[in-house]
Swiss-Prot record:
Catalytic activity: heme b + (2E,6E)-farnesyl diphosphate + H2O = Fe(II)-heme o + diphosphate
CDD domains: PT_UbiA_Cox10 (cd13957)
Entry protein name: Protoheme IX farnesyltransferase
InterPro entries reported in the protein's UniProt record: Protohaem_IX_farnesylTrfase (IPR006369), UbiA_prenyltransferase (IPR000537), UbiA_prenylTrfase_CS (IPR030470), UbiA_sf (IPR044878)
Gene: ctaB
PROSITE patterns according to UniProt: UBIA (PS00943)
């Protein structure tokens, strides 16, 4: 009996954890770390930890509310039908309450423990993801990812503001890198999930304009992304080292973009999507490494 109860509790905890979209949350926190490390000045380690926890909670809040709102279309898509809400493991009301609570807590704690600017940016990122992307753009325009991608680009600015209590052109450049990365990343996924998106009536770029035009735009955005990724060298301590890392990773990114335009198959698009995740991690790892003095 006790074993059964424990298993049910564990299963419930895991389902609420899945509401947070943890894979996205890890990337969000990592890019926030990059913003903190590149910022001038210093921050007490405990406050830095609090800041990152708030960023994680804010990201999870947006993810949970997104799953609450999208529960109807999630049920129609193979990729999402087993999520906690459409599968019936978590009620829609519980998910919404969970998401709102996390969002309020994250912004409140950030404001009280860290500073108001970082808290305001965190609030804007949550609200942008929920209201601008999820509720307004996602089901209405093929530019949903292009504009909505701004929501996921805020974490480096939040990290920077947590340290400096300000917003600067340097943090905006980090924002811009993620903003330019988002379209080719998600379009590569949507090319392989066209039937899912069509079934759910989501006007992804490839559904509205076709796969061939989407592949061309992936290449265009990939080139723009790689060019944008060179800009952090303007303020990093190890600028030349960073440039070499960014150019190397960027050339591979463009190679994958050319591959999907050339081969036009599921495998090349899957490889592009997978590499895009590794690319962003490696790029921001390079930013972190080239911001610190090890010797």
């Amino acid at each position: 009996m006790y074993t059964s109860v424990l298993l049910n509790v564990e299963s419930t905890i895991l389902d609420f954890w899945r509401l947070l979209k943890p894979r996205i949350m890890y990337l969000v926190v990592f890019t926030a770390v990059a913003g903190m490390v590149t910022a001038p000045g210093s921050m007490h380690p405990f406050l830095a930890l609090i800041s990152l926890i708030c960023v994680a909670l804010g990201s999870g809040s947006a993810g949970a509310i997104n799953m609450w709102y999208d529960r109807d279309i999630d049920l129609l898509m193979e990729r999402t039908k087993n999520r906690p809400i459409p599968s019936g493991r978590v009620s829609a009301e519980s998910a919404l309450e969970f998401g709102i609570t996390l969002g309020i807590l994250s912004v409140f704690i950030m404001a009280i423990a860290v500073n108001y600017i970082s808290a305001a940016l965190l609030a804007v990122s949550i609200l942008f993801y929920v209201f601008i992307y999820t509720i307004w753009l996602k089901r209405r325009t093929p530019q949903n990812i292009v504009i909505g991608g701004a929501a996921g680009a805020f974490p480096p600015m939040i990290g920077w503001a947590a340290v400096t209590n300000s917003v600067s052109w340097e943090s905006f450049i980090l924002f811009l890198v993620i903003f330019m990365w988002t379209p080719p990343h998600f379009w590569a996924l949507s090319l392989n999930k066209s039937e899912d998106y069509a079934k759910a009536s989501i006007p992804m770029f490839n559904i509205v304009y076709g796969p061939e035009k989407t592949r061309k735009y992936i290449l265009i955005y990939s080139v723009l992304l790689v060019l944008t990724s060179l800009l952090p060298a303007l303020f990093l301590k190890k600028a030349l080292l960073y440039l070499s890392m960014a150019i190397f990773a960027g050339c591979i990114f463009i190679w994958y973009a050319i591959s999907i335009l050339r081969f036009k198959n599921h495998n090349s698009q899957k490889q592009m999507f997978s590499y895009s995740i590794s690319y962003l991690f490696s790029l921001f790892a390079s930013i972190i490494f080239c911001s610190i003095d090890l010797f």
